[in-house]
From Swiss-Prot:
Entry-listed glycosylation sites: 138, 226, 396, 583, 757, 921
Chain sites annotated for binding Cu(2+) 1: 120, 992
Gene from which the chain derives: Cp
Listed GO MF terms: copper ion binding; ferroxidase activity; glutathione peroxidase activity; oxidoreductase activity, acting on metal ions, oxygen as acceptor; phospholipid-hydroperoxide glutathione peroxidase activity
Lineage: Eukaryota, Metazoa, Chordata, Craniata, Vertebrata
Binding of Cu(2+) 2, residues: 122, 179, 1036
Catalytic reaction list: 4 Fe(2+) + O2 + 4 H(+) = 4 Fe(3+) + 2 H2O; 4 Cu(+) + O2 + 4 H(+) = 4 Cu(2+) + 2 H2O; a hydroperoxide + 2 glutathione = an alcohol + glutathione disulfide + H2O; 4 nitric oxide + O2 + 2 H2O = 4 nitrite + 4 H(+)
InterPro entries: Ceruloplasmin-like_CuRO_5, Cu-oxidase-like_N, Cu-oxidase_2nd, Cu-oxidase_C, Cu-oxidase_fam, Cu_oxidase_CS, Cu_oxidase_Cu_BS, Cupredoxin
Name this protein carries in UniProt: Ceruloplasmin
Disulfide bonds: 173-199, 275-356, 529-555, 632-713, 869-895
Record-listed Na(+) 2 binding positions: 407, 416, 419, 612
Binding sites annotated in the UniProt record for Na(+) 3: 762, 771, 774, 950
EC number: 1.16.3.4, 1.16.3.1, 1.11.1.9, 1.11.1.27
Cofactors demanded by this protein: Cu(2+)
Length: 1061
């Protein structure tokens, strides 16, 4: 250990001789925080007083808006007697810590609170004794002192700002964070979190970034006060009858979740003010739990982030991102989270753009076009599946035992598959008498409004006529407008009159005028056209779910034909995947009256009734009923994707049979979140009928899946790829007993170090739970076609865990997988990204052997700006959901031709990580597992919520709580981490590496120590380990941390050649 430390010190001090020393004196203090200090009347979006009172009003069993918290404060010096004022907008966040590359930062921490806390920094380099995180890491004595700073004690943390943060493609200064890490989720919920800004060498002048006028740091978080260490104190202090409080009551718990920005909720965040034409830098991060799916929307502004144009920034727990904006359009604007549940719960703030007579950037565009649209909102009867059939199974949608029955069955208290909705429809002129007929190319649009398109420099005029029964509007994204033309109504105190633009009454008409200045258009890195959307913003939640949404595309100057189609593109498709929540529709009561046979018996609060109205659709179509997704072999296709909704709307839209290019990367699955939009470029090279579907398991079974067809048309299309290399793998599906947690030692030591005594619902058997062992089926490699001898996994493969064998291929190869089904039910093997002869994956019956052939053309390999090797997943598709959760998944790695020989004389270390909550309730073997492993199988109720929860195994490669072994490397190794995400709505995983940053490529090289994973995300992360030690690797989502989605990786000093393991 002494040798290990000595080598670490020599390395750090030799490389940092030129460092600048910076000192911060930070105290942890307990204080009462008010989440909504400004109580003046504001007009917020989708919020009524009843909703705000639910969170802000205290009472007999309600805490209200004030909570005792522990917060980081900055002091002038080591006496800790005088605090330094911070900007009002920082809220309860700790002080901003700033460093340039090569700086050395000393954080003098004093704990003035009543319990142990620490200081753990993201994105910087530190040795083990400055990590500030509690977990079993084989350290002793002085290396443990950083793990717990007791009340009244002090500790100095020494941090080094090193390459690779920020990365070459990053902005000059990037967002990082620091927080306490005894029990990180509880410490953060108690208030201990702050921003750390890391900058490239020479980019700061007097502690401000050069060429930036204003900077702001924003944390979007649903702060869960139920997890705070001070919950008991807060109940005693702020509830008028504390003895009546039931801490397990769902309403009580929800009232303590504060939907806030920097600790301010319901529009009370102060101090966001700037001049028009100011160059503004936003440092943004998310924090929290599965509910923390945020879409930060800067109304009226254009931002660039990672060189792409945007007005929405998606944030998840520990997502770290920055954005640049030139403030425009003087006025008071809304900064909101467009997750519709968060909008209703008060996650909104105002920012002011003042007119300070600063010269604004010149817009020197000649010959402006005015594009005029005539759009009405009108009622329609909408059928989510006009054929009455599940196109995937051929069955009637109401067939017994079918997944679709719950949504399409009509009856006494069920609406069925048809709903009265509102839709935007286009007319020829302002008389609104002749509706424009949709052509065959527009058939796929479905419920969506007409496409509004424009080029940079254009003016858009939309004459909107409301034929409905409620006030409605049109709120665009991706264009510039004045406050008088905004379709969302909100306002600071004192602005009370309803504006015409944001409140078009029934039978009224309003003409909107929007412009497309240069900064709203695509950047050099963007595609030719940007996918955007428009929707009704009177009450976005109700209006969007009623059907009022449509696509927009904003394109580079001169890129469109007269009819709006993009030059050099054969076909354009618009896809809007969302869970239409008809319970939130403006017309719910009409639908109950019209379509149920006993409307007076309907209980709108009944969970089953609500579930039956959640329509998992694309453009308003379910189970393959979307028409018009037809194209020709070899055509140039653009897909414009966009979404809206809430935290359930985490989508992985998978195009089987083909890949696309987006942001320089080659992919086949696009991740979408509320209000996010994407442009995908595809050249289909295989004819047949393929699936476009959401990989999020509940969405897939719920009907969010369609078919697209690639035809051989007149145009001759030849695939000239010559597949020279041939690789054969012998893989079998084998049933095994799988133990998610063979040793409880790491978990027990963790809880001992945290001084917590916690039971474990996932691993403890108790009376009738299954425990940690389950029968599963896994892919395993064999030596030859006799399938007699399984390939023994080497030390470097130990970390694979449940994963099948890594299948490696280069572009131009043909991979033959000889697959034997040694299990007891039919399975198959199907890979993402590859080309196959047929669009059908044939199941292999028990005992059978079948050969699956995968071709690896150019479009299966890395894009121009990708890493040289990129991961895809392979899995069984007989029943996508049950096969996956039963255990069948593995990695496929595709490298550029001859990459290894040319680029890398030194072999890279490779590690494969699958972050997945294995839902054992969905496994084929659930009944077997109850029989075999439950102490009292006869007592098991498979619908019991606690039983269901106990079978959700939060695992990395199928292992929990430090049980994933074999992640061992040396200083100076080059390491590729191939990370994969699959699963359901809860499978948003923010993967955090302690001790090291990594690099990844998105049209440029970026650096971070947290990467966001979703169902269908496959990504290469490159790491160059430099600090020896055993380091934590975990998901940063609160529930996932507590449920055991964590392990460690070990970096050995360069001289110490020992066996890994």
């Amino acid at each position: 250990m002494k040798f290990l430390l000595l080598s670490t010190f020599i390395f750090l001090y030799s490389s940092l001789a030129l460092a600048r020393d910076k000192h911060y004196f930070i105290g942890i203090t307990e204080a009462v925080w008010d989440y909504a200090s400004g109580t003046e009347e504001k007009k917020l979006i989708s919020v009524d007083t009843e909703q705000s009172n639910f969170y802000l009003q205290n009472g007999p069993d309600r805490i209200g808006r004030k909570y005792k918290k522990a917060l980081y404060f900055e002091y002038t010096d080591g006496t800790f007697s005088k605090t330094i004022d911070k900007p009002a907008w920082l809220g309860f966040l700790g002080p901003v810590i700033k460093a340039e590359v090569e700086d050395k930062v000393y954080v003098h921490l004093k704990n003035l609170a009543s319990r142990i806390y620490t200081f753990h920094a993201h994105g910087v380099t530190y040795t083990k004794e400055y990590e500030g995180a509690v977990y079993p890491d084989n350290t002793t004595d002085f290396q443990r002192a950083d793990d717990k700073v007791l009340p009244g004690q002090q500790y100095v943390y020494v941090l080094h700002a090193n390459e690779p943060s920020p990365g070459e493609g990053d902005s000059n200064c990037v967002t990082r964070i620091y927080h306490s890490h005894v029990d990180a989720p509880k410490d953060i919920a108690s208030g201990l979190i702050g921003p750390l800004i890391l900058c490239k060498k020479g980019s700061l002048y007097k502690e401000k970034e050069k060429n930036i006028d204003q900077e702001f740091v924003l944390m979007f978080s649903v702060v869960d006060e139920n997890l705070s260490w001070y919950l008991e104190d807060n109940i005693k202090t702020f509830c008028s009858e504390p003895e009546k409080v039931d801490k397990d009551n769902e309403d009580f718990q929800e009232s303590n979740r504060m939907y806030s920005i920097n600790g301010y909720t319901f529009g009370s965040l102060p101090g966001l003010s700037m001049c028009a034409a100011d160059r503004v830098k936003w440092y943004l991060f998310g924090m929290g739990n599965e509910v923390d799916v945020h879409s930060a929307f800067f109304h009226g502004q254009a931002l660039t982030s990672r060189n792409y144009q945007t007005d929405i920034i998606n944030l998840f727990p520990a997502t770290l991102i920055d954005a640049y904006m030139v403030a425009q359009n003087p006025g008071v604007w809304m900064l909101s989270c467009q997750n519709l549940n968060h909008l209703k719960a008060g996650l909104q703030a105002f920012f002011q753009v003042r007119d300070c007579n600063k010269p604004s950037p010149e817009d020197n565009i000649q010959d402006r076009h005015v594009r005029h649209y005539y759009i009405a909102a009108e009622e329609v009867i909408w059928n989510y599946a006009p054929s009455g059939t599940d196109i995937f199974t051929g069955e009637n949608l109401t067939a017994l035992e079918s997944d679709s029955r719950v949504f399409f069955e009509q009856g006494a208290t069920r609406i069925g598959g048809s709903y009265k909705k509102m839709a935007y429809r286009e007319y020829t002129d302002g008389s609104f008498t002749n509706r424009k007929q949709r052509g065959p190319d527009e058939e796929h649009l479905g419920i969506l409004g007409p496409v509004i398109w424009a080029e940079v420099g254009d003016t858009i005029k939309v004459t909107f006529h409301n034929k409905g029964q409620h006030p409605l509007s049109i709120q665009p994204m991706g264009v510039s407008f004045t406050a008088e033309n905004e379709g969302t109504y909100y306002g600071p105190p004192g602005r009370s009159s309803q504006q015409a633009a944001s409140h078009v009454a029934p039978k009224e008409t309003f003409t909107y005028e929007w412009t497309v200045p240069k900064e709203m258009g695509p950047t050099y890195a963007d595609p030719v056209c940007l996918s955007k959307m428009y929707y009704s913003g009177v009450d976005p939640t109700k209006d969007i779910f009623t059907g009022l949404i449509g696509p927009m595309k904003i394109c580079k100057k001169g890129s469109l034909l007269a009819d709006g189609r993009q030059k050099d593109v054969d076909k354009e498709f618009y896809l809007f995947p969302t869970v239409f929540d008809e319970n939130e529709s403006l017309l719910l009561d009409d639908n109950i009256r019209m379509f149920t046979t006993a409307p007076d018996q309907v209980d709108k609060e009944d969970e089953d009734f609500q579930e039956s109205n959640k329509m998992h659709s694309m453009n308003g179509f379910m189970y393959g009923n979307q028409p018009g997704l037809n194209m020709c072999l070899g055509e140039s296709i653009v897909w414009y994707l966009f979404s809206a909704g809430n935290e359930a709307d985490v989508h992985g839209i998978y195009f089987s049979g083909n890949t696309y290019l987006s942001k320089g990367e080659r992919r086949d699955t696009a991740n979408l979140f509320p209000h996010k939009s994407l442009t995908l470029l595809m050249n289909p090279d295989t004819k047949g009928t393929f699936d476009v579907e959401c990989l999020t398991t509940d969405h897939y079974t719920g009907g969010m899946k369609q078919k697209y067809t690639v035809n051989q048309c007149q145009r001759q299309f030849e695939d000239f790829t010559v597949y020279l290399g041939e690789r054969t793998y012998y893989v079998a599906a084998v049933e095994v007993e799988w133990d998610y947690s063979p040793s409880r030692a790491w978990e027990k030591e963790l809880h001992h170090l945290q001084e917590q005594n916690v039971s474990n619902v996932f691993l403890d058997k108790e009376e009738f739970f299954i425990g940690s062992k389950y029968k599963k089926v896994v892919y395993r490699q064999f030596t030859d076609s006799s399938f007699r001898e399984q390939v023994k996994r080497r030390a470097e493969d130990e970390h694979l865990g449940i994963l099948g064998p890594p299948i490696h291929a280069n572009v131009g190869d043909k991979v033959k997988v000889v697959f034997k089904n040694m299990a007891t039910r039919p399975y198959s093997i199907h890979a993402h990204g590859v080309k196959t002869e047929s669009s059908t994956v044939v199941p292999t019956l028990p005992g059978e052997v079948r050969t699956y052939t995968w071709q690896i053309p150019e479009r299966s390999g890395a894009g121009r700006e990708d890493s040289a090797c990129i991961p895809w997943a392979y899995y069984s598709t007989v029943d996508r959901v049950k096969d996956l959760y039963s255990g069948l998944i593995g990695p496929l790695i595709v490298c550029r031709k001859s990459y290894v020989k040319v680029f890398s004389p030194k072999k890279k270390m490779e590690f494969f990580l699958l972050f997945l909550v294995f839902d054992e309730n969905e496994s084929w073997y659930l009944d077997d597992n109850i029989k075999t492993y439950s102490e009292h199988p006869e007592k098991v109720n498979k619908d019991n919520e606690e039983f269901l929860e106990s079978n959700k195994m939060h695992a990395i490669n199928g292992k929990m709580f430090g049980n994933l072994q074999g992640l061992t490397m040396h200083v100076k190794d080059e390491v590729n981490w191939y990370v994969m995400g699959m699963g359901n709505e809860i499978d948003l995983h923010t993967v955090h590496f302690h001790g090291h940053s990594f690099q990844y490529k998105h049209r440029g090289v970026y650096s971070s120590d947290v990467f966001d994973l979703f169902p269908g995300t496959y990504q290469t992360l490159e790491m160059f380990p430099q600090t020896p030690g055993t380091w934590l690797l975990h998901c940063h989502v609160t529930d996932h941390v507590h449920a055991g989605m964590a392990t460690t990786y070990t970096v050995l000093p360069v001289e110490q050649e020992t066996k890994s393991g």
